[in-house]
Amino acid sequence: MDSVVVSLPMSGDEAVRLDSRFGKLWAASTVSALGSGLATVAAPLFVAARTGNPLAVSAAAAVAWLPWLLFALPGGVLVDRVDRRRLMIAVDSTRVAAMGVLATAILTGRDSIALLYVVLFVVNTGEIVLRSASQAMVADVVPPGRLERANGWIIGGATTAEFMLAGPLAGFLFRVGNGLPFLANAATYAASAILIGWIAGRFRPAVREGLIVPAGDGAARTSGLRSVWSDLAEGFSWLVRQRLLRTMAVLIGLLNITLTGAMAVLVLLARQRLGLGSVGYGALFACLAAGGILGSVIGDRLIARVSATWTLRIGLLVEAALHLTLATSHSRYVVGFALFAFGVHGTLWTIVANSLRQRLTPPAMLGRVGSTNLFIAAGGNCAGALLAGGVASTFGITAPYWAGFVVAVAVCVTTWRVFSRSAMAQAYAGSPAEAAAGLADGADSPAT
């Protein structure tokens, strides 16, 4: 019998409960995020313990994001062609093996920074597929009226695990033994694979009934009959025609350059300016997570109250404020609060972005459209990680944060009117095909 994950007194499909299928997907996402968070914190600590070179530290972040540039797009095609549940199990199993090798090497004294880079590359290649498949499965098991709440739960669970729990835990485990965070990471991926295996049903888009193919994009296709490039072009061209989704994708790619750059050298800022050790550095991520948790709890109600338009606009201001704080403050408490506020913004932004994409995108294209967004975001992540080390080495540790502030202010000024109330209202109304058609280039949507 399906267990209840959450229920609110709503009408229509908004009153439908999120059942045990979503509960298992949420649990898998959360436990996997815990493991990924352990590696995210432990990797720069591992490199910094062996070399104080900012380039080597930021390179760990760059290597982690490089697979997103190489494999995000074909990964989306794969998600749209095969059973998403089975694919996620296979990927998690591969990640267990990779992290197990790294943990064993560190614990036996046979480690190297090069091996860490290789494992990060493999694990994050799998993360691409898992992220796209998981987002698509949310749309499979959750009715449209509950997407904001479901995405809030997914983001809240992942944020709690990856930052609130993983940060301090990784710092503690690293002090006990450098290989322990990576060993624990392998165990979480194994648990995730088991949980996904318990989800009932088939999740291959081509065999589901009610497959939606947008007008003008060709007749319904059979998986495998078209080339990967044709599938990629179909998903990309559809996204390009959707003004709102296209703008959000480009915007997050640009902002990720400065944000990832800021986070790539945060370990050095924490040590040199804030006087924090490994546990204190992890606590900064806990502040970020606390904000994310608050955002996930109040997200669907806050977005409904203040509107998606102002949720996004205020979030852009918060982003600018974060960079300014990191550039000027010497107080660990002020920095912690800034990260907390950014955590709230980050969760609210992601809820809006994911829910809009799941609403507007035809089911058979969710993998490709989602992976295209991930590719654009990853481009910014990788560029930011690569640039931050060089900028910090040349101009000082605060230089990446000043650059981030300037970019964030410029983005606020140039995109303020894009997220109008009329565009958002149209996106939340009607069927996915109708809403997407209304928001395509050429459709009337006055900015307000």
Predicted ranges, named:
Residues M1-T448:
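Alpha-helical transmembrane-bundle signature of multi-pass membrane transport and export proteins
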